[in-house]
């Protein structure tokens, strides 16, 4: 850790903030009433009777290490076709039938809101202010290299080319969370992908679609994977 502190000022978790680590490989659900009692945000359009339990143990541990050692973090990632459990896209979180778009819209809102709120509340607990540790979020990862080998976002929203509604919605939700905590001027939202230098125009088309008709630029950067 001393080497990291001497040579670097931020780190990115490889797997600990990916959806399958927070949601779990198998569903653990609770009733909406139980979730509200625990402080979970439930969207107005959420019509299901249960929600997934979210596990932040490893995320909290990383935030604590960062705060203790004066390091920043890049949060990776909220929406990805890979390393998101298939059950998250299933009807009632429990079978092999796909859920529908309206239900998935509400689940996306539930997940992004609760993950970002938890991180920023933890930052406030550790340092006194939100946005003090996580300076960037990879909101959507590798949409342009999406694969359909398992149940995922494209099962629900189909192939939308350069105009995927759930990708734009993810950035709208994430930016809304930054504004709710008044950190939109110090935390940046990224679209993250690899081989971006091979498909520059396609990447720009996607980012322009995300920002189109928005009052503010909700996607402010492109992450170029260099590992």
Features from the language model and the residues they span:
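Distinct, well-ordered alpha-helical segments
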Residues: 1, 149-150, 198-215
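Intrinsic structural disorder
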Residues: 1, 162, 222-223
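Beta-propeller domains
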Residues: 189-207, 221-226
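Short helix-capping and hinge/turn segments at secondary-structure transitions, especially at repeat
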Residues: 215-216, 227
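Glycan-processing catalytic domains of CAZymes
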Residues: 3-5
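Glycine-enriched alpha-helix->loop->beta-strand junction motifs that scaffold or abut catalytic
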Residues: 7-11, 216-219
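Solvent-exposed, well-ordered amphipathic alpha-helical segments
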Residues: 175, 219-222
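Substrate-binding cleft and catalytic face of glycoside hydrolase catalytic domains
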Residues: 10-190, 194-196
